[in-house]
From Swiss-Prot:
Localization in the cell: Plastid, Chloroplast
GO biological process terms on file: translation
The entry's keywords: Chloroplast, Plastid, Ribonucleoprotein, Ribosomal protein, RNA-binding, rRNA-binding
Keyword RNA-binding (UniProt): yes
Protein name (record): Small ribosomal subunit protein uS14c
Annotated source species: Bigelowiella natans
Record gene name: rps14
């Protein structure tokens, strides 16, 4: 199980990304289509003023059962350990153990 502080930090990041997403996209589009260098530099300074944790790249995929960040399978939303456990217990429909 992941530490509670890490999970809370991740929730905080998700909220910040959701809150500043439209403003960040608008600034990026303005920078992309700006004509002068001075206008571009002013827009970039505005973009830098936004919180760092409001960037989507800062989010981390985590297992929804254990909260582990490593060994994450996107299709299931689980870490590798929980995927194996739940697969053996037949808790994931359509998942079968491979044998050849």
């Amino acid at each position: 199980m992941a530490k509670k502080g890490m999970l809370e930090r991740e929730k905080k990041r998700q909220n910040l990304v959701y809150k500043y997403n439209s403003r960040r996209q608008a600034l990026k589009n303005s920078i992309k289509y700006s004509s002068s260098f001075s206008e571009t530099s002013l827009l970039k300074k505005e973009l830098e003023k936004l919180p760092l944790n409001s960037m989507k790249i800062r989010l981390r995929n985590r297992c929804f059962v254990t909260g582990k960040p490593r060994g994450f399978y996107r299709n299931f939303g689980l870490s590798r350990n929980m995927l194996r456990y739940m697969g053996h217990e037949c808790l994931i429909p359509g998942l079968m153990k491979a044998s050849w």
